Amino acid sequence: MRHYEIVFMVHPDQSEQVPGMIERYTATITGAQGTIHRLEDWGRRQLAYPINKLHKAHYVLLNVEAPQEAIDELETNFRFNDAVIRSMVMRVKHAVTEASPMVKAKDERRERREDFAEAGDDVDAGDSEE
């Protein structure tokens, strides 16, 4: 079996359906004896350019190891699902399991916010003691 990186973009009005879509697509892969190495839901993000007069889309990234039949079925599902506005399936040489730069940047921002909040609490505590 080969390794693939799959990214698909969902219409922003259909964001509520994304968990069900992810479940359906992962079931397709695991049902064909494939494995999912990484699954990231990037959420709703700004597009670089409008697609079908849309400026935002909901992004999902999958890194999988699956047979060609499962990938063909996924591509067919993407093509006939009107909620999926773009998809890309790319073959990669190795399984990728570490977090993508998108998730790493998000985690770093969260850590900075937490550090800032803690620093703000320390300053507030110092003011109340005087």
Curated annotation (Swiss-Prot):
Residues 104-116 have a biased composition (Basic and acidic residues). GO terms for biological process: translation. Residues 100-130 are annotated as: Disordered. It comes from the Bacteria. Keywords: Ribonucleoprotein, Ribosomal protein, RNA-binding, rRNA-binding. Pfam families: Ribosomal_S6 (PF01250). InterPro entries: Ribosomal_bS6, Ribosomal_bS6_CS, Ribosomal_bS6_sf, Ribosomal_S6_plastid/chlpt, Transl_elong_EF1B/ribsomal_bS6. Coiled coil: none annotated. Belongs to the bacterial ribosomal protein bS6 family. PANTHER family: MITOCHONDRIAL 28S RIBOSOMAL PROTEIN S6, SMALL RIBOSOMAL SUBUNIT PROTEIN BS6M. Binds together with bS18 to 16S ribosomal RNA. This is Small ribosomal subunit protein bS6. It comes from Pectobacterium carotovorum subsp. carotovorum (strain PC1). The gene is rpsF.
